């Protein structure tokens, strides 16, 4: 279930080099940025990720495609390449489209705060019932993110909503 505990081709190990980005959106308290970054570093450390960089970004106008501005995404892409990061954690909520677009731009796996917390719960669930509940929550969370992930295999579309 966990994307971090698998050692498959698309999985991650506990020592995965990780970058954390906290987007400070309009209307949020600006004094919380350092606290949020420290908290996110602690959450990532809870599942053994190797946080190599943590940055704060002020977002004046959230973009529908990526949440962050174009220059900020370019900066993150350069940082991911420079540091050799395999995972980017956005300390906020991302839509499935934003997550996919960021992954395409930064060339690394991207998860948001909800995904990170689900991974922590999944790793720490002690009972079979707890593991099933976390897996159900994780599958529900992933459902919207899988909708357009196989579009490269489509040849034609038709009908209502297709």
Task: List the predicted regions and their residue ranges.
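Extended, highly charged alpha-helical segments
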Residues: 116-162
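N-terminal accessory targeting/assembly segments
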Residues: 1-119
